[in-house]
UniProtKB/Swiss-Prot annotation:
Protein family according to the UniProt entry: Belongs to the universal ribosomal protein uL29 family.
Keywords, sorted A to Z: Ribonucleoprotein, Ribosomal protein
InterPro entries listed in its UniProt record: Ribosomal_protein_uL29, Ribosomal_uL29, Ribosomal_uL29_CS, Ribosomal_uL29_sf
Full protein name: Large ribosomal subunit protein uL29
Keyword Membrane listed: no
Matching PROSITE patterns: RIBOSOMAL_L29
HAMAP family tied to this protein: Ribosomal_uL29 (MF_00374)
Superkingdom of the organism of origin: Bacteria
GO BP, sorted A to Z: translation
One GO CC term, this protein: cytosolic large ribosomal subunit
Length: 64
């Protein structure tokens, strides 16, 4: 997910996306622990996407 895509979202959309990514991160952690994960790079991608969303949410809250 690109930062421009994240900045274009509303706070409600960002919160929904954040919840979805946290669920995915939880599932990926279990897959990694059991050795079932195929795309290991996805763990890092999800973590960085969560950070991007949190950063943009924080910036939007500071503006309001």
């Amino acid at each position: 997910m690109k930062i421009d895509e994240v900045r274009g979202m509303t706070p409600d959309q960002l919160n929904e996306q954040l919840v979805a990514l946290k669920k995915e991160q939880f599932n990926l952690r279990f897959q990694k622990a059991t050795g079932q994960i195929e795309k290991t790079h996805r763990v890092d991608e999800v973590r960085k996407d969560i950070a991007r969303i949190k950063t943009v949410l924080r910036a939007k809250q500071a503006q309001a």
